[in-house]
């Protein structure tokens, strides 16, 4: 490559698509710098192999960025606190990473004086949108180059291109595209394109020789796990430890079908044991400490947050507002959750919190309470029926009378009360003798 060639920073994973991009971009006249952004899920040997792959296919220089903590701080923490599961099953394992990868690639690109940035996304998935939106927002001055998308390259074509030039084809190249990261692993391709086809047995079946069932205890502070079995452990380190433990049981494996940012349907297989355990445990702890409407509105906004993140719209200012609400809602989400792990499944079997609103000293569901009397409960239940009674009256004209018990006014006289349903049917306002006395007094 001539020294005057313009510099380009390529988001590089070491997989087939980005491996193809290196020599293809070099042939097009670019001095290609590969940038591997570690978002979790890779081992030192994995990173060594990625570095060798980049050099063997012609990278001028290879850069590595450890972004695991940034992924956790910027994205994963809100996915936990928001209990975000797309389609009620999938914890957004990939969406949390792509924007951070774009952020890191732009930082490297500016550091090396690059004129362009590139990625290996196809034209049919979500990643192209996530990368392009982030790159345009972060670095509008940089050209975006996408060989796979622009040339419509398929996997078999990329393999043939590399083989013809005597360049190494990634060892795992084949029918599947695999993404491993802090928040889980996904598989795309092959069987995932046929909605009737099942996955390989190893994807959904528990390991052949899992350990016996066991329990763990997670300690929580402000809606985030901060301890594992009484020992301080948080962030990426806790997720990694929990993910390894879940994998021994085969916990967290499933299939997700959803709508892409482009409006088409997509199907993936995934394994995200740590994500599912943390979200499940966090949700149960929240039930102790949040009011019904706190949980309701937080969940509605968190669902929107997940949708926007999934579709590459992380930089929409509304997401900063939602993050502020989520953070505020977690002030009292502290305590412990007890989780039972077994082959292929987990259960949250216990929760406790110093801020629990489940207080046996004042009330026990279905048994007794000290906050109200039986007469007060009867009155509450009667008033609670009003909207449905009114709706029935409006829909049916004259709804059938419902059996009702008598109620007493404060003087204890049943003769001074009138049936609420009779008043609803006649359209009259209920008026007791006591109320009449008050009206007369005002006269």
Regions found by a protein language model. Give the residues of each.
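Short, low-complexity, charge-dense intrinsically disordered segments
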Residues: 396-414, 418, 423-425, 429-443
């Amino acid at each position: 490559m001539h020294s005057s060639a313009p510099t380009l920073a390529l988001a590089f994973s070491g997989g087939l698509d980005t491996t193809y991009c290196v020599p293809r971009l070099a042939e097009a006249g670019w001095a290609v710098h590969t940038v591997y952004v570690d978002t979790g899920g890779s081992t030192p040997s994995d990173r060594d192999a990625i570095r060798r792959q980049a050099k063997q296919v012609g990278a001028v220089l290879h850069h590595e960025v450890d972004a695991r903590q940034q992924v956790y701080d910027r994205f994963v923490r809100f996915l936990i606190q928001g209990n975000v599961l797309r389609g009620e099953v999938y914890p957004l394992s990939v969406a949390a990473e792509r924007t951070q990868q774009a952020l890191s690639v732009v930082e490297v690109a500016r550091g090396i004086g690059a004129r362009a940035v590139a990625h290996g996304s196809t034209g049919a998935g979500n990643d192209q949108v996530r990368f392009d939106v982030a790159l345009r927002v972060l670095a509008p001055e940089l050209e975006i180059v996408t060989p796979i998308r622009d040339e419509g390259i398929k996997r078999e074509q990329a393999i043939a291109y590399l083989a013809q030039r005597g360049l190494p084809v990634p060892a795992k190249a084949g029918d599947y595209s695999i993404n491993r990261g802090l928040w889980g692993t996904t598989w795309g391709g092959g069987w995932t394109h046929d909605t009737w086809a099942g996955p390989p047995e190893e994807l959904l079946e528990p390991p052949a020789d899992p350990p016996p069932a066991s329990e763990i205890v997670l300690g929580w502070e402000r809606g985030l796990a901060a301890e594992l079995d009484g020992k301080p452990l948080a962030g990426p380190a806790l997720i990694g430890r929990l993910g390894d433990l879940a994998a021994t049981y085969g916990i967290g494996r499933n299939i997700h079908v959803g709508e892409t940012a482009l409006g088409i349907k997509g199907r993936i297989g995934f394994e995200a044991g740590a994500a599912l355990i943390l979200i499940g445990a966090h949700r149960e702890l929240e039930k102790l400490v949040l009011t019904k409407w706190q949980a309701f509105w937080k969940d509605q906004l968190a669902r929107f947050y997940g949708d926007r993140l999934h579709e590459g719209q992380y930089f929409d200012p509304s997401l900063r507002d939602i993050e502020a609400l989520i953070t505020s809602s977690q002030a009292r989400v502290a305590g412990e959750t007890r989780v039972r792990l077994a082959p292929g499944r987990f259960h949250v079997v216990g929760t406790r919190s110093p801020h629990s609103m489940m207080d046996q000293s004042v009330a026990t569901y279905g048994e007794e309470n000290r906050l109200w009397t039986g007469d007060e409960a009867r009155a509450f239940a009667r008033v609670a029926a009003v909207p449905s009674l009114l709706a029935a009256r409006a829909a049916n004209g004259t709804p059938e009378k419902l059996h009702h018990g008598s109620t007493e006014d404060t003087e204890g006289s049943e003769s001074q009360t009138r049936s609420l349903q009779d008043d609803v049917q006649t359209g009259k306002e209920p008026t007791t003798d006591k109320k009449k006395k008050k009206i007369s007094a005002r006269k």
